[in-house]
Amino acid sequence: MTTEEESLSPGEEGYSVQRDFWRQAAKSDGFDLENVKRPPGMNGVVIGLIPYYCQLYNRYPYRILVDLFAKVGLHRYNLFKGTSFEVAALIKFNMLQNYMSSFYMTLLAHDPDPAASSLEKTFQVRVDEQDYGTLHITCSIARIKAEGNLLVVHYFPYIFFNKISLSLLINNECCIVSTETPFIPHFQGGARAYGIFKGELPDWPSDDAFNDGKRFYLVKESEWQSTDWISMYLELVITTTDRSITETRQKTEVLSQLEIVKVAIETANEDVEPPNERLKAKSAHVYITFKGLAEPRAPRRVFENGEHVERQAIVRRVMDHTGYLTLKGKLCGGEYIKKRSLALKSGEESQDCKKQARVG
């Protein structure tokens, strides 16, 4: 230990170790921590990324959600590149110790297209949660590992944290860590949205509105069955709204009971030929009618129970020119309550996704 290091106060030493951790983690954009070193006795001091090795240990936290986030990354890559990659295996992931976290995942994927190579590719996927108790995530990285660019690394001299989200306050020096943008452990931005894709999610349209063929494309059953991202969107809405599905008991049976009844797509460009090309739109609202969810749960809402009940979910997809993909969604219906003990009164309806005609 140098004389300078010996003279550091405990607080200064903590900052120094914290800074050094993120400097090392930034070299791999947060994906590879195997060679990140920490001084002895400092593991509890450094607030950083927690690594999980999925092929060594069968049990890891948020398993259902992490698996879905890995699929989101490949969905982004496929939209951007026109490929059809599917998850073969999750190798590892690192996550922040935050209420709303960021996930840095490494996985194997293959493209079932006969014209594609049969070899599996190693992908790196980053997904940041933007909200808790609802679907609002951004995927900013989805790449084949071998295609990653070299990094130009500078580092934050001081890093501070709060309990809800990771805040970075920079003193004295600037940090630029990435191929294109600064490395920030928890990214709170998103894809740039325009027009009907800005602001709050829309209300659930009326039955008559769905008959407007210029506004909506009604997805054929054969199309949604062959399009795995539609069921993925639905599962994301349900698991992010009811975190008990993925946090503790890993209730996979809940998702296996879901049955899609109807799907409609709304895009900004209404004159697309053939109409099913709207499925590939970078920005879209996806309206999903489904059943099979016996006991829906959402913060401060109660629902009518029963697998037979048809329910609605809305998902907004926005992917901008940078490749950022933001997904925002909600489970419709239910009755808002002030206290958890209050029950849904017969005949009352939530205003969250009330049906109304499109304005403008």
Annotate each language-model stretch with its function:
Residues 1-360:
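N- and C-terminal low-complexity/disordered segments
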